[in-house]
Each structure stands twice: as structure tokens, then as C-alpha cells.
Regions:
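N-terminal hydrophobic/helix-forming segments and targeting peptides
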Residues: 1-466
Length: 466
């Protein structure tokens, strides 16, 4: 072996692509932006995933009387989480190749009794969702999405702020001339959560003697447009997200800025990898789940039993309606999962928060993260060396550009994914996803080259991992 071959050197994806692959990479970037623009919330993302899956020949598992090799099925969990699967030729008890991502992102949720007026305006009270820097959400045009379930059970869809001609919404900030006290606070205290109130109106009713003139006028507008009353907010799920479409960044258009890259970029990469698979040996599964940003709790989060239930349903449909508990356990224990979540990338504006030899970089391919957690690996899923070796060999054998990463310097911070939850099923799990800048900001950055290479990595895992 030559001396130069002894050293491990990372590579840039762009350097490894030929002209045809570069075109495919840039075209995928355009498709990914279109995906993001239709997926501003977890509900809309789930709907877009299902729409694309149906176009590719997937059918709802609820419509199937039996399953056989090559069948393509999906499951819609309450409109907020999705499972896609292409049935393999091997028995499900032999295990599945699973890529698990999440489709929720940090945002501002609207409270259940949110409407009030003050200072000649009408506002909505919010409760932030996930790990946000609160100061990033002020002085920013916002769009409003969600559903309102009326007293009669009718569900009203809300989507305002992103179409041409739509109004936007806004959280005001304090002018610097009067911000002496605010500026003396820490960044986490400068904007309080209870101050993240969204401007939604400013016109009063004509009756100058009426009380709550501005609130009443706004409620009248909502009633005329959507047929709702104030009480209907009690049974509503509304989310404020940054207004605006995904855009290219840079003169060379190599990057994409958008809301929700975490973790819709890995969800998209997994979806693109899965839709073209026809007849795998091992059953392939794409998971697109909710509530990861707040602990993966609830019926649509990964802590729920919906995936176990779906594995049981698939086994039963493949075995004449028969499924035992041990069959489900074997199927899960013999599976391998790539926890498809984003990784923090080296930021040249903040170069001292990571150990750069063990920190991902933009444009260097899918980031494998052996362990997550914080401090002394608290809360981590720590993938076994044997698993890392198998995945590394898979990537090397199929020309996948990869890098390794962890979340910053020891004791600098930390975080987690769904990996540890899935490992509780006794399956092998490793984190592997797209490296990004400005994670959890209203607008985040990823590289088109990394989106392309991550999708290739997931495809090779789906089809060729054993």
C-alpha cells in the first residue's frame, strides 16, 4: 500500500460527479425546492409524500387483501406521519431496510384562545414549537397554515401567506432607540416567548362605541371567509412559518435556503430513493414521522405503536391473515435503520464550536453520525463498529461520498434523533443525513450536492444492504 493511501481524506461530492451526474444533481435541487414549497408543515408534507407515492404506484395498505413481493403500499397516520413500503421477496421476519426521517420542523403554534386586540391592532398569541432562538422569529414575514375543525365537524384548511397576492403576518420588534433594557439581556431573554404575538389585522368596525372594535372586525372577516367563530380556534391546529419559497443561494446556485430543511431534506432524499424501487429482496420501508422536535411523543411520533402495528399488518397480509407477536419482534430485531436526520455543518462564521476533524462540512456527502447525545453521550444511540463498518463498505462499494460527524465539541451542547427509539426494538441503527447550516433557524441552508448524494446513499441502502 502506498503511503498516500494510509490517510483518510474527505472528498467533495462535486469533484466525484461527471457532467451527467452534475445535471441530475441540479435537477434534483429544483424538484426538492418544489417539494419544500408544498410542504411548509407536517400535514402538508405528509400529503405531498402520499401524492408522490400514489403517482409512483403506491396504494393504501387499507385497500389490500394480501401482500406479495413487489407490492407498494403506504399508511397515512392521522395526516401527520406516513409509512411507505416496497415488499421484498424475503419473508418480513428476515428484517427490513428502513430509512426513518421526520417531517415536523421548529415553528410557532397558535394558542387555543389566541385572538386579542391591543394598540389599534389584532393579534394572535403563539406557543413556539421545538428548539428555536426566539429572537430569530421577530421582524419576519410569516405565513399561516393549518386546519380548523368547526362545531359541526367540518374541517377548514388554512393556507395564507405564500401565494402571490396573499397578505403575510408579522411579529414586531423593539426599535433600537428604545431597546436599552432589551439589549442588556442575554440573547435567550431578549425576546420572551409570550411576546411572540402575530399581527393579523388593524381595521376596526365602524361602530365607534363598540368594545373590541379591532378584534370584532377581524373575527367578522374570518367568519365571512371561512365560516368560523372565535370558539372554533379551540379545535384548531394553526402554525406560523416563514413566508416565502425555497431559493437558490450563491452566484453558482449550489445551495438552497428554505424553511424546514430539518428534516424534510432527509425525508425528500429518502422518498426520492424509495419511489423507483421495484422488487427488492428485503422489504424496504420509508418512515416520515411527526413530533421529533419535541421528543417524538404522541400518536404520530416515533414513540407511538403505529410502526409496530403496521409491521403486524404487513406480516398478516403476507401470511393469510396470520401474525404472531414473535413474528413482529423478529421482523423488527432483524431490521436495520438509517436514522435520516440532519447534521450540523462547519460554519465559517462560527468556527470554534466543533472539533473540525469530527465535524461535517457542506458539500462532502452524507454525514454518518455514530453517536448523538450530549456531554458524556447522554441519551445517545451509539452505533456498533460492526454496523458502521458494513454501512461504510456499502457506501464505498457503490461510489457514495460520505463523511463522519458528531454534534460539536464535547460539552458544547448536544442533541438527539429517533435513533435510540428504534434501537429499542433490538435493531441496528445509525444516524446518517444531510449536513446543514443555520439548523433550527427560520431559514436554513443545505447543499444540492449533499441532497443528491444522500438520496443515492439511501437508495443503495434500500436495495443492497444485507
Amino acid at each position: 500500500m502506498e503511503t498516500k493511501d494510509l490517510m483518510y481524506k474527505r472528498a467533495y461530492v462535486w469533484d466525484k460527479l461527471n457532467a451527467e451526474e452534475r445535471k441530475v444533481c441540479m435537477d434534483m435541487g429544483e424538484d426538492y425546492k418544489a417539494f419544500l414549497n408544498e410542504s411548509k408543515t407536517e400535514r402538508r408534507c405528509a400529503a405531498e409524500i402520499i401524492r408522490r407515492a400514489k403517482e409512483a404506484g403506491f396504494v393504501c395498505i387499507c385497500e389490500k387483501k394480501e401482500l406479495k413481493a413487489g407490492d407498494k403500499v403506504y399508511y397515512n397516520n392521522r395526516g401527520k406521519a406516513v409509512m411507505l413500503s416496497v415488499i421484498g421477496s424475503e419473508p418480513l421476519e428476515n428484517g427490513m431496510n428502513i430509512v426513518g426521517s421526520h417531517i415536523d420542523s421548529p415553528r410557532l403554534d397558535i394558542k387555543q384562545n389566541p385572538v386579542y386586540e391591543a394598540g389599534g391592532t389584532t393579534l394572535l398569541k403563539t406557543h413556539y414549537y421545538g428548539g428555536v432562538k426566539k429572537y430569530q422569529w421577530v421582524a419576519l414575514p410569516l405565513a399561516l397554515y393549518g386546519v380548523i375543525v368547526k362545531t359541526n365537524g367540518e374541517k377548514v384548511e388554512i393556507a395564507v401567506g405564500d401565494k402571490c397576492g396573499d397578505p403575510v403576518f408579522y411579529i414586531s420588534d423593539l426599535l433600537p432607540h428604545l431597546a436599552k433594557d432589551q439589549m442588556s439581556k442575554t440573547m435567550s431573554e431578549g425576546v420572551e416567548g409570550e411576546s411572540l404575538n402575530i399581527l393579523i389585522g388593524s381595521l376596526p368596525v365602524d361602530d365607534t362605541e363598540a368594545s373590541d372594535r379591532f378584534k370584532t372586525a377581524l373575527l367578522a372577516v374570518l367568519n365571512e371567509r371561512y365560516g368560523i367563530t372565535e370558539e372554533d380556534f379551540v379545535s384548531a391546529e394553526l402554525e406560523a412559518v416563514p413566508a416565502g419559497a425555497a431559493r437558490d443561494v450563491g452566484f453558482d446556485r449550489g445551495l438552497i435556503v428554505a424553511h424546514g430543511h430539518d428534516d424534510r431534506v432527509c425525508s425528500y432524499a429518502s422518498l426520492a430513493a424509495l419511489l423507483g424501487i421495484e422488487k427488492p429482496e428485503r422489504t424496504t420501508v420509508g418512515l416520515y414521522v411527526d413530533k421529533e422536535e419535541v421528543g417524538s411523543i404522541g400518536a404520530t411520533g416515533m414513540h407511538s405503536q403505529f410502526f409496530n402495528n403496521m409491521v403486524g399488518e404487513m406480516i398478516a397480509l403476507m401470511n393469510g391473515g396470520v401474525c404472531s407477536d414473535i413474528s413482529i419482534r423478529r421482523a423488527l430485531a432483524h431490521s436495520t435503520l438509517l436514522s435520516a436526520d440532519v447534521a450540523a455543518a462547519f460554519d465559517p462564521n462560527y468556527p470554534n464550536v466543533g472539533d473540525n476533524a469530527n465535524f461535517a462540512a457542506i458539500g462532502q456527502g452524507i454525514a454518518m453520525v455514530k453517536y448523538t447525545g450530549s456531554r458524556g453521550k447522554s441519551g445517545a444511540n451509539d452505533a456498533a463498529a460492526e454496523l458502521v463498518g458494513k454501512v461504510r463498505k456499502l457506501f464505498n462499494d457503490h461510489g457514495v461520498v460520505y463523511q463522519t460527524s458528531e454534534l460539536g465539541k464535547v460539552d458544547q451542547g448536544g442533541g438527539g434523533t429517533i435513533a435510540y427509539i428504534m434501537a429499542n426494538y433490538d435493531m441496528d441503527v445509525i444516524d446518517a443525513g444531510v449536513a446543514m447550516l443555520s439548523m433550527h433557524a427560520p431559514w436554513e441552508i443545505v447543499s444540492k450536492a449533499d441532497v443528491y448524494m444522500t438520496s443515492r446513499a439511501y437508495h443503495e441502502f434500500f436495495v443492497n444492504y444485507r
